[in-house]
Amino acid sequence: YFSKVENFERMSFHSNYEDLNWDIVEVVFICVQTPNNTKTNSVDTKFLESAISKIAELNNKDIIITVKSTIPPYEIENVCNNIGFDQNLITFNPEFLREGSAVYDFFNPDRIVLGGLNTDKTDKLKSLYKDFDAEIIITDPISSQLIKYLSNTYLPMRLSFVNEATRLSKYSGANLQDVLKGVGFDNRIGSHYFRPSPSWGGSCFPKDLVEVNNFYKDGDLNLPLISNIIKSNNEHLNWTVQQMLMLKNDNNLNKIYLVGAAFKEDTDDLRNSPTL
């Protein structure tokens, strides 16, 4: 992609904040990782906190600090309190890029979500996307983050449904491909994200689902569908392994080759890959 860039004077890469010319900076997009903390089983915001803290040291309230990283609703309050920064100066622009097609997805978004309490900052942020042919949703910070989390909840739920349909088709002796094709032709359902797999994985769906379960369980709220998506995925992976073992034993096989170690096609990402 970078070979197509005509004017590299508009693009530069740096490994530390000091090398940047902050005098000309109007908007900062923070895209740091927010991994799952295995000790607390909750999102780790230390990278986000460090990034905001570095920018806050400039003491320039005109800079629009925009968080693209995925963090739970209300968590930005804790982050800003830890570093003594006004959370109302933060805007949000959650990303919905897919691994393997990130550049295409950036230029062809289904929607653009902007969250913030300062209308001047969100309006300026909106102007950056004036040439994009996509619906722009401007909302509050909490809603913008929940949009991202619920998107990353629905998609694995849909994948889990297909995988359960796979087991049901196998049990009943039905033709799985015909079943999914027949169901997917319903316009209310569609055929996108509707293929069976050993199970789903990756660096986003698992951790985001864990966090969704964390923040709704803090209150008196029961969400039986959402709370069982991970369980369904784990059970399908176990079922897949059992099917492979049966295939091995029934045919006296000594070796089984697995093609594709990444968690999805068109990527080399091995994080939380069900194959491994």
Residue positions per predicted region:
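Structural/interface elements that position substrates and couple domains in central-metabolism enzymes
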Residues: 1-276
